[in-house]
Design a protein with these regions (language model features):
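Mature N-terminal, pre-catalytic/accessory segment of carbohydrate-active enzymes
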Residues: 1-7
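Aromatic-rich carbohydrate-recognition surfaces in CAZymes
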Residues: 80-87, 135-160
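Internal amphipathic alpha-helical repeat/solenoid segments
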Residues: 47-89, 94-116, 121-137
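Short glycine/serine- and small hydrophobic-enriched flexible loop segments
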Residues: 91-98, 147-158, 217-224
Length: 236
């Protein structure tokens, strides 16, 4: 890559690189590659190459696979299955790259095969499915749910809400509502966030957390976009 001078990076003159206001509030989105001295042309090319490899590269390199006419999944190549973390990360990549078709394909696959409508985990997504859609487990991993919700909110703001499962913001709010309120009635499962200490659980059935699941920058936006009754929870 060709490097450019620091003065050409586009970072606002005089602004501290450790400014704590945040990009959402400041409306200034830092380009860390540019700050390291790479040209925008090189950055755009590198990012697009990575996306094309993941989604449309050779079979021994890609891990996105179209399924039928309107669905697709991301494969965990080490286990040859589809997992909610990979599916939700894939949706986040697509909305960041303005790739609505791929986003909708992944989301439809997740809703069709991973979403659970019965049992104590109804309203959550099965964390692992075979690539034909058969569920490997009937449990959920909360990191997938929180990434699904944020990707859906971003999609709503970027493309607007559609109908059915493509009413992105409605789907996100419903998912977060279940994550917070499940278990309030006896025999209805457990919430993904502990109602007492507000910490995300490793799995709903256990009372310990996973540090890698904690995404406070997500929760700040959930406090703005989730159901109004749940916003104080996300602000806590």
């Amino acid at each position: 890559m060709h490097k450019v001078e620091a003065a050409e990076t586009g970072f606002p003159k005089g602004r501290s690189v450790d400014n704590m206001q945040g990009a959402f509030a400041a409306k200034e989105y830092r380009n860390l590659f540019a700050q390291c001295g790479y040209s925008q042309e090189d950055i755009d090319r590198k990012v697009e190459e990575a996306f094309q490899t993941i989604f449309y590269g050779p079979e021994d390199q890609r891990f996105y696979h179209p399924a039928g006419e309107d669905m697709g999944y991301l494969e965990d190549t080490g286990n040859h299955d589809a997992r909610t973390e990979g599916m939700s990360y894939g949706m986040m990549m697509c909305v960041q790259m303005d790739r609505k078709e791929e986003f909708d394909r992944i989301w439809k696959w997740a809703k069709t095969y991973m979403y659970m409508t019965e049992g104590e985990n109804a309203g959550y997504f099965a964390w692992s499915c075979q690539t034909d859609g058969t569920k490997n487990a009937w449990g959920a991993a909360p990191d997938g749910e929180e990434y699904f919700a944020m990707a859906l909110f971003f999609a709503s703001h970027r493309w607007g809400d559609g109908e059915g499962i493509f009413a992105y913001s409605q789907e996100a709010r419903k998912l977060l509502h279940d994550c917070v309120h499940k278990g309030e009635a006896p025999g209805t499962g457990r919430a993904m966030w502990d109602p007492a200490n507000k910490l995300i659980r490793f799995v709903a059935e256990q009372d310990f957390s996973d540090p890698s699941y904690h995404l406070p920058h997500f929760y700040q936006l959930f406090a703005l976009w989730a159901d109004e009754e749940d916003r104080p929870f996300w602000e806590a």
